[in-house]
Curated annotation (Swiss-Prot):
S4 RNA-binding domain span: 37-99
Database matches in CDD domains: KOW_RPS4
Designated gene of the protein: rps4e
Keywords, alphabetical: Ribonucleoprotein, Ribosomal protein, RNA-binding, rRNA-binding
Source species, domain of life: Archaea
Organism listed in the record: Haloarcula marismortui (strain ATCC 43049 / DSM 3752 / JCM 8966 / VKM B-1809) (Halobacterium marismortui)
One GO term (biological process): translation
Cross-referenced SUPFAM superfamilies: Alpha-L RNA-binding motif
Annotated GO MF terms: rRNA binding; structural constituent of ribosome
Gene Ontology CC entries for this record: cytosolic small ribosomal subunit
Keyword flag Magnesium: no
Name of the protein this chain belongs to: Small ribosomal subunit protein eS4
Annotated PROSITE patterns: RIBOSOMAL_S4E, S4
Protein family: Belongs to the eukaryotic ribosomal protein eS4 family.
Length: 234
């Protein structure tokens, strides 16, 4: 199977120029599904820390590139929304955040913020033993005690080292959200109204912003965040 993908066919979330070359690297198996961006693209095209695959592999073999607290050696490992990237040798830390047009962008954060990551709950399932399994937006799962306060659509912050929930943001009117897809990707505002749609169609969400502006999008495209997640300057 080819390790390359045509640039014109890559997802909109990939931060690559589509007309500069015919092919780009293909994402390997891992979290985030089709929207995951290969780590090589982040190192080469976004940060400029490597000129090619060979240089990226050399850097990764030094074990000082971490994603969500774990050292990564695979340059094709997918990187996606709200992942935490740490470059320990450089003492640089980033959170992956939606940028304009839905392209993934890196927001600089401080070392303390890099100790945990945000996850949107997309599924909630009762498992044997009376516990609950939460499925997150990136495909990861988390077992928690049976707690009725967690619902699909909520967001949680999970510690990278111990996997414990350190914060919980409910999806409700008044919540601070960001759009991660669609025409308003990267925009931030407060949920003004959740319009419940009968049947299998998605609910609509009206989001208000400063100075009377706002936007409307589908529920799937919004993620509840804390104000610290819009940008953490060191």
């Amino acid at each position: 199977m080819s390790n390359h993908q045509k640039r014109l066919s890559v997802p909109n979330s990939w931060p690559v120029e589509r007309k500069t070359a015919t092919f780009t690297v293909k994402a390997g198996a891992g979290p985030h599904g089709e929207s995951g961006v290969p780590l090589l693209i982040v190192l080469r095209d976004v940060l400029g820390y490597a000129d090619n695959r060979k240089e990226a592999r050399y850097a990764l073999n030094e074990d000082n590139v971490l994603i969500n607290g774990k050292a990564i050696s695979d340059e094709e490992r997918p990187v996606g929304m709200f992942d935490i990237l740490a470059f320990t040798e450089r003492e640089e830390y980033y959170r992956v955040f939606p940028g304009e047009g839905g392209r993934l962008a890196l927001t600089a954060i401080d070392p303390d913020a890099a100790q945990s990551k945000l996850g949107k709950i997309v599924t909630k399932t009762h498992v044997s033993g009376g516990d609950v399994q939460l499925g997150l937006h990136d495909g990861e799962t988390l077992i928690v005690e049976d707690d009725q306060t967690y619902d699909a659509g909520d967001s949680i912050v999970v510690g990278n080292e111990d996997g414990e929930v350190v914060a919980h943001f409910e999806y409700e009117e008044g919540a601070l959200v960001t759009a991660v897809d669609g025409a308003h990707a990267g925009e931030v505002g407060e949920v003004e109204e959740i319009q419940v749609t009968p049947g299998s169609a998605q609910n609509n969400v009206i989001v208000s912003q400063d100075e009377g502006e706002g936007f409307e999008t589908v529920e799937e495209y919004v993620v509840v965040i804390d104000e610290n997640f819009t940008g953490d300057d060191e």
